[in-house]
């Protein structure tokens, strides 16, 4: 089985949007990334776009600034593979959630809701993920001409407390 997921982060607030999985889904009532299983020969990005459209009610993430692959997990027997992405958008938005979600929340980075889906927990608490997030933020900052931007500056403080 192949699956994809994404953590969506608002540039304006520096918060991440998490999905509370429905009681009818596997890993029910756990917080996790947005995404799901790929269909047939669907590619990772194609599947992620479809899943986000289904789960968020939008044709993609509104006002996306950047997207980056952050991690690929494959089981030893290679029967399961999950590809994780980080999506940076301009601002928080309200999704129109579907039956796979019981809710959503925007949270400060490093202050993840509980209980976390085990796969999301492994990703979100990993140094590799934090490094990718830092790199994306730094890249966006260096491209900006507006020196007034403090986008996500609190992340270093939040990360230090994790």
Residue ranges and their predicted role:
Residues 1-17, 37, 86:
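Conserved N-terminal beta-strand and adjoining loop/helix that marks the start
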Residues 5, 30, 103:
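Conserved beta-strand and immediately adjacent loop positions that scaffold enzyme active sites
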Residues 20-24:
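Short, small-residue-rich loop/turn micro-motifs
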Residues 25-29:
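A conserved beta-turn-beta hairpin within the catalytic core of GNAT-like acetyltransferases
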Residues 30-36:
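Conserved acetyl-CoA binding element of GNAT-fold acetyltransferases
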Residues 36-64, 69-123, 157-161:
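Unchanged
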Residues 121-162:
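Charged phosphate-binding loop/patch that engages nucleotide di/tri-phosphates or the phosphate backbone
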């Amino acid at each position: 089985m192949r699956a994809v997921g994404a953590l969506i982060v608002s540039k304006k607030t520096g918060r991440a949007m998490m999905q509370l999985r429905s009681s009818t889904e596997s890993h029910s009532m756990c917080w996790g990334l947005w995404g799901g299983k790929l269909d047939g020969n669907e590619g990772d990005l194609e599947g992620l776009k479809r899943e986000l459209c289904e789960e968020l009610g939008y044709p993609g993430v509104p006002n996306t600034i950047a997207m980056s692959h952050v991690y690929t997990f494959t089981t030893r027997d290679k029967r399961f593979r999950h590809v994780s992405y980080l999506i940076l958008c301009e601002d928080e938005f309200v999704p129109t959630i579907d039956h796979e979600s019981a809710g959503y929340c925007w949270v400060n980075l490093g202050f993840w809701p509980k209980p976390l889906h085990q796969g999301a927990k492994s990703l979100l608490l990993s140094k590799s993920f934090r490094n990718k997030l830092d790199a994306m933020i730094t890249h966006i900052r260096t491209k900006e001409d507006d020196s007034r931007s403090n986008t996500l500056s609190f992340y270093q403080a939040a990360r230090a407390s994790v």
